[in-house]
Amino acid sequence: YEPAILEGIKQQNAEINAIIQNPEKADFRNTIEAFEQSGELLDRVTAVFGNMLSAETNDDLQALAQKIMPLLSEHSNNITLNEKLFARVKEVYNQKENLQLNPEESKLLENAYNSFVRHGANLEGEAREEYRRLTTELSKLTLTFSENNLKETNRYQMLLTKKESLAGLPEIIVEAAAETAKSEDKEGWAFTLHAPSYVPFMTYADNRDLRQRLYMAYNTKCTHDNEFNNIEIVKKIANTRMKIAQLLGYKDYAEYTLVKRMAENSESVYKLLNQLLEAYTPTAQQEYKEVQELARKEQGEDFVLMPWDWSYYSNKLKDKKFNINEEMLRPYFELEQVKKGVFGLAEKLYGITFR
């Protein structure tokens, strides 16, 4: 990945220099469209690298990420803080009313200009250098946060050695847990914090103590006294985001983020959330009451429903009320069936054939 990423950076730098050094007056084609088409190789490589880092990472990829991410952050800053490049973008933007652009071109121009502004192009002097420093720092912090979360998730394992501990679990989940244990030369059944293991266990396992153990492990990730603790990292991320937002003239990071979203501001978000809260609360309270009643019928009137009980008893209630069990649906969503459905639909709608 590293040679390809470095080559991608080199290619995009050459493409950006070509835009800047173009002797012709800045226009949509030679500036906005040319900028949009730059960095094709880098985009392709970083997309693959990012997906692999998220879905199938290892120590080598994580070490490479620590090296590559600051380079990518620096490269991004070198583009958006390039005064000559922004001058050309701004020149085109300022004459947008006279360019007779179609809707797609107008949107592209608007996005390009706003992206430069949102990434510090209007900053000057010390403020510009401070923005560069803060964004580089934020890139490192967010990468560390993600890596800690991933490592903490990967290192946890709940190994069960007694068959009775598996009561309630579908056979396919039991088999998968046995395979996980076997892959590490262990006897028994290993359950992890990864969704394919965690979610079914919380939904079907009869053993409440084990549900609690797994739930607490999942919900206290990166808070323990070890090298993966993210508490201080989160504080630093929040503070750095606040500094970036205020440097760019916003009240806080929420305002900075929401400007380009449908909600536009924090007040709209809170208004919607409060409307939803008011609308959903009666239904949520009724559902909670039903789940609690079902649990108490099984466990006694003194039973108190806890977070690690919710998935288990709400699934039981769903099965009881609607006779729907997710395990009944599993054969319909087996990988090959899903592939047939998705690819078949693409062929039917768009005439695209996958082989």
Question: What residue spans do the PLM features occupy?
Answer:
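Short, contiguous, well-ordered secondary-structure segments
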Residues: 213-235, 240, 270-271, 277-278, ...
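Membrane-entry segments of alpha-helical transmembrane domains in multi-pass membrane proteins
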Residues: 2, 27-33, 226-230, 269-276, ...
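A conserved hydrophobic secondary-structure block that centers on an alpha-helix together
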Residues: 111, 120-134, 221-256, 264
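N-terminal helix-rich structural modules
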Residues: 2-169, 175
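Second-shell loop/turn segments in exported
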Residues: 2, 116-117, 197-204, 222-227, ...
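Active-site-adjacent "gating/activation" loops or surface patches in catalytic cores
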Residues: 183-221, 310, 322
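Active-site-proximal, well-structured secondary-structure segments within enzyme catalytic domains
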Residues: 108, 132, 137-140, 147, ...
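Membrane-interfacial helix termini and the short, flexible loops that connect transmembrane helices
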Residues: 20-24, 52-57, 205, 214, ...
